[in-house]
């Protein structure tokens, strides 16, 4: 009989039975089949293979992106074990991810999701899941509408990230917990709840919870919904289509190993490569291969793209800054929303969001500073289940602390550096290459960053983070 664990609803979830047959993909062909019994199927990192079980309780060990597992519906209790970040496919019940700083995401069923000895981000997805960190400082992420989950080993250095539930303070959390035997039950919304196994309320503390943005303390100071693109002409307009230090034909950031030239659409020799378009209230920034006709004007760069700044129109000290955007998922695309000092110095720099197109589950949040006398950076790579379509990317900058948000849920935080207390302006851009690496296909289909809006807010004078 297989071992089970009880989920938040009191339902038993199975770990699967013990294996009775073992298979290795080393030396196999592209397909490796199991038996009708309980199989252990071991991939090989150098073998491009799909392993296919049968009706038993199967466990698959995956070591690289060319290793795959496939199961039919209702064909036993099946588990994937991997060091890689992994999203559980349908028809699988359980997942173990052991890689440090990786993620393990469940599917629509009720899953058992486990981490390893290091830090992981664990999200059961839909269903009523059982989540185990298994050591390290883990992040357990939950989204409204995805069911009721149980954390089996919530530790003092673990964090719960709550998205869509409206909790804005630790006091709000404590007001919604109740002890039920050895377990602590947090009522969420719509009949959903989160159970902390073998935990009492006095074991919780505020820094274990990444909560929602409290918008009641914000006053809007800037908004562009992109019904049109208001380019600056020196006397009016909102957006500068080039860095303040760049010549009229535009520029790029050579120190970042970027592969694109930021085109200024008001510069006639490159106007044919205008990277900006507006449709139905959405600004699209397009990166694409540079035509030979303009490469003399773009210093021979292989790609063209666009960037916008509010250097000449808007800067602010502290507040909340937000962009709602649909990010590209193309290899080598490097979209960003960020802040720079209004006096033209660098550092500091505050990156609200950066992404690499080929890694859509990672939201990068960074603060750069010179407070130690040399340039330093504090970066966080927040793991999220889905960035397809439009999402909100924001940062709350206060005198004491910086907090980054994804869809109104806090995902990272850092102390405000001593040299970040002066007005900063906003930038939106789509780079190619650099940290994201080169495109694998020459970007023949182009890459698009779509921006629904950019907004900024000041903070109420008597509010503290």
Curated annotation (Swiss-Prot):
It is an enzyme of class 3 (hydrolase). Its EC number is 3.2.1.-. One of its GO terms (biological process) is polysaccharide biosynthetic process. Pathway: Glycan metabolism; exopolysaccharide biosynthesis. It is found in: Secreted. Hemolysin-type calcium-binding repeats lie at residues 33-50, 105-122, 123-140. The keyword Repeat applies. The keyword Hydrolase applies. The active site is at 349 (nucleophile), 354 (proton donor). InterPro entries: ConA-like_dom_sf, GH16, Glycosyl_Hydrlase_16, Hemolysn_Ca-bd, Serralysin-like_metalloprot_C. Its main location: secreted. CDD domains: GH16_laminarinase_like. Belongs to the glycosyl hydrolase 16 family. Cleaves high molecular weight succinoglycan to yield LMW succinoglycan. Dynamically regulates the molecular weight distribution of succinoglycan by cleaving nascent succinoglycan only during a limited period after its synthesis, perhaps before it undergoes a time-dependent change in its conformation or aggregation state. This is Endo-1,3-1,4-beta-glycanase EglC. It comes from Rhizobium meliloti (strain 1021) (Ensifer meliloti). The gene is eglC.
